[in-house]
Amino acid sequence: VTMANIAQLINNLQSLFLAHEDRFIVTPNFHVFEMYMPHYNGQSVRTVFTAPEVNFTKTDNNPDQLSGLAGSASLHGKQLILTAVNPSITEARETEIMARGAKIKAAAATVLSEKDVHARNSFENPDAVQVKKAEVRIAGDNALFTFPPASVVQLTLELG
């Protein structure tokens, strides 16, 4: 990613911030932008995701599908940044993550997800939706991680 742009920065639909008089809060969209920032100046890495598709009905009552997981990866020396989205609002995605030609030595996860997919930050509850750390297991040369339903996840993988 060379540049990301958002037109409505403050007090609009999908904005990063909300402000009113002397109050200022960040939205979940801010956290997503922050989670994708580590890709900056990285070497793009091809990713392949295999997960069951998410079936849904559009507002015009026509059926449609989304990939069960989607994301991107970038390499910074021996550190691989993987960001992914699980669009299913009901199903977690148990995964095995492989780095072709490398061994995953250590891993950390940052997760943005809430049980209520309608949760939002407000002036009354500014920290309702926050990023959280999650466990990533190492199994041999690979990593094991469960993507929660309706989540955006940043994995930092140390390669050896």
Regions found by a protein language model. Give the residues of each.
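C-terminal beta-sandwich/jelly-roll accessory domains of carbohydrate-active enzymes
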Residues: 52-66, 80, 85-160
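A structural signal for short hydrophobic beta-strand segments in well-ordered beta-sheet cores
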Residues: 71-73, 136
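Aromatic/acidic polysaccharide-binding cleft in carbohydrate-active enzymes
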Residues: 1-70
